[in-house]
């Protein structure tokens, strides 16, 4: 990616972030006259820039995923701390997001440390504009993913804990457990030397080709369900959060990239073709009989 493309990407990313922050700030609680949602959106990007500088100077990507996770945790705690509505629902949302972020962030951080580098960044980290754009994209990812929860925490609407919150939490818990189990199964599979250059077909991976992504999509829908009763007015716009996660993981990165890579790597492999024909691409379900 050249400098012009990177700069355009950064501009578009920031424009989308500003739009989301502005719309959701229209019905947000304020602190000293500043919308809580908009303030937290600003801090999200400030965190990215603070860590981007030493990362670029040292030409390292080791703190990229970790920074994303820490941003989720920091903003969740900050928003609850600043909100005048200290409710059980807000605390629950912050805990749900923090638990997910701690688990995923540590998993990705140690995976990169073990592998030595993240090959996505080999060239990117040497190009200022491209690397900077990527950190901005991460900021937008955090904002859009966190949007529904942040909108609920920023909402002036007061609601009582009810069955909708319980249902949403159970959806989140189910998705979280699926993601954790799937990641652990694949990590153990890859750790065995005899599985080098092989694809996993056991455990949850026998029912879905991407169970970890299904789990992540499901848990963010759970977060949105918990957040839903607290929303009003323009804050409903933040319900794009789980939709964004779904599109991102199935159309932009995640599933689409890994499917293309797998078809290229195991092209002509009859066992892989059989696995594709038998196994659901995303939603776990019993393998087809062929």
Question: Which residue stretches match the model-derived regions?
Answer:
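C-terminal ends of transmembrane helices
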Residues: 49-60, 106-113
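Loop-to-helix transition at the N-terminal end of transmembrane alpha-helices
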Residues: 31-46, 61-73
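Hydrophobic transmembrane alpha-helices
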Residues: 14-24, 28-31, 44, 72-104, ...
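Short, amphipathic, aromatic/basic-enriched membrane-interface segments that mark the entry/exit
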Residues: 3-6, 34-39, 56-64, 206-211
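Juxtamembrane/interfacial segments flanking transmembrane helices
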Residues: 109-120, 185, 254-259
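N-terminal membrane topogenic signal
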Residues: 1-14
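Juxtamembrane helix-capping/reentrant segments at transmembrane boundaries
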Residues: 58-74, 117-134, 198-205
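Short juxtamembrane and helix-loop transition motifs at transmembrane-helix boundaries
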Residues: 1-2, 23-32, 52-59
């Amino acid at each position: 990616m050249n400098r012009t493309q990177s700069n355009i990407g950064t501009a578009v990313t920031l424009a989308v972030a500003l739009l989301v922050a502005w719309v959701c700030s229209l019905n947000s609680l304020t602190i000293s006259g500043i919308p809580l949602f908009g303030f937290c959106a600003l801090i999200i990007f400030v965190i990215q820039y603070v860590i981007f500088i030493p990362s670029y100077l040292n030409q390292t990507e080791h703190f990229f995923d970790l920074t994303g996770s820490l941003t989720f945790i920091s903003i969740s705690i900050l928003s609850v701390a600043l909100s005048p509505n200290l409710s059980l629902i807000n605390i629950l949302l912050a805990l749900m997001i923090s638990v997910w972020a701690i688990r995923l962030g540590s998993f990705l951080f140690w995976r990169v440390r073990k592998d030595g580098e993240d090959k996505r960044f080999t060239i990117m980290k040497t190009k200022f504009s491209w690397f900077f754009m990527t950190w901005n994209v991460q900021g937008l990812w955090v904002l859009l993913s966190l949007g529904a929860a942040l909108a609920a925490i920023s909402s002036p609407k007061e609601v009582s804990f009810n069955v909708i919150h319980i249902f949403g939490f159970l959806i989140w818990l189910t998705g979280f457990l699926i993601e954790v189990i799937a990641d652990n199964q694949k990590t153990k599979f890859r750790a065995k030397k005899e599985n080098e250059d092989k694809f996993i077909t056991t455990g949850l991976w026998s029912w879905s080709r991407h169970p970890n992504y299904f789990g992540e999509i499901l848990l963010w829908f759970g977060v949105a369900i918990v957040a839903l009763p607290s929303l009003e007015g323009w804050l409903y716009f933040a319900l794009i959060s789980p939709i964004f996660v779904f599109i991102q993981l199935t159309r932009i990165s995640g599933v689409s990239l890994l499917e293309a890579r797998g078809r290229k790597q195991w092209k002509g492999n009859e066992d892989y073709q059989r696995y594709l024909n038998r196994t659901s691409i995303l939603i776990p379900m019993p393998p087809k009989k062929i």
